[in-house]
């Protein structure tokens, strides 16, 4: 069908929803005046609201067009297995592994020198970051 028909259907549905809301507000004010506040909405207002909502949703679904498939195979056809979970933005090269996996003789000599001078320890920390 023509897109203008679905837009018209949505317009009619929204108008019916607005009319149902106005009718509900009028009914509530009438119930306050008659001091019968514990009664519920009449069935015709409830049915009009539900029908208008269904008509509006039906029109909106037809205006939206074709939906995409939920199956991911159509989007993954042109990707290789290596690039599937490859996120280079998460690579970190400045980490503590360089200090942890240093040869043991360099670690022992740095520990002895660190005990001798506190200032050299601070400088050595910055040197390890520059390497």
UniProtKB/Swiss-Prot annotation:
Keywords: Endoplasmic reticulum, Endosome, Golgi apparatus, Magnesium, Membrane, Phosphoprotein, Transmembrane, Transmembrane helix, Transport. Signal peptide: none annotated. Its main location: endoplasmic reticulum. Residues 1-3, 64-131 are cytoplasmic. The chain crosses the membrane at residues 4-22, 44-63. GO terms for cellular component: cytoplasm; early endosome; early endosome membrane; EMC complex; endoplasmic reticulum membrane; Golgi apparatus; Golgi membrane; membrane. Induction: Up-regulated by low extracellular Mg(2+). It comes from the Eukaryota. Residues 23-43 are lumenal. It is a multi-pass membrane protein. It is found in: Endoplasmic reticulum membrane; Golgi apparatus membrane; Early endosome membrane. One of its GO terms (molecular function) is cobalt ion transmembrane transporter activity. One of its GO terms (biological process) is iron ion transport. Abundant in heart muscle and kidney with lower levels in liver and brain and very little expression in intestine or colon. In kidney, highest levels in distal convoluted tubule. The modification Phosphoserine is found at residue 120. Belongs to the membrane magnesium transporter (TC 1.A.67) family. Component of the ER membrane protein complex (EMC). Part of the endoplasmic reticulum membrane protein complex (EMC) that enables the energy-independent insertion into endoplasmic reticulum membranes of newly synthesized membrane proteins. Preferentially accommodates proteins with transmembrane domains that are weakly hydrophobic or contain destabilizing features such as charged and aromatic residues. Involved in the cotranslational insertion of multi-pass membrane proteins in which stop-transfer membrane-anchor sequences become ER membrane spanning helices. This is ER membrane protein complex subunit 5. It comes from Mus musculus.
């Amino acid at each position: 069908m023509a897109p203008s028909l679905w837009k018209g259907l949505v317009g009619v549905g929204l108008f019916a929803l607005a009319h149902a809301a106005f009718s509900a507000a009028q009914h509530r004010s009438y119930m306050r005046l008659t001091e019968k506040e514990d009664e519920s909405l009449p069935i015709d207002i409830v049915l009009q609201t539900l029908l208008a909502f269904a008509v509006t949703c039906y029109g909106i679904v037809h205006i939206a067009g074709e939906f995409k498939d939920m199956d991911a195979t159509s989007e993954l056809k042109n990707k290789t297995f290596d690039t599937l979970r490859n996120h280079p933005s998460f690579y970190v090269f400045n980490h503590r592994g360089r200090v942890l996996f240093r040869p043991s003789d360099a670690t022992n000599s740095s520990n002895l020198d660190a005990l001798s001078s506190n200032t050299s320890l601070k400088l050595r920390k910055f040197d390890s970051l520059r390497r």
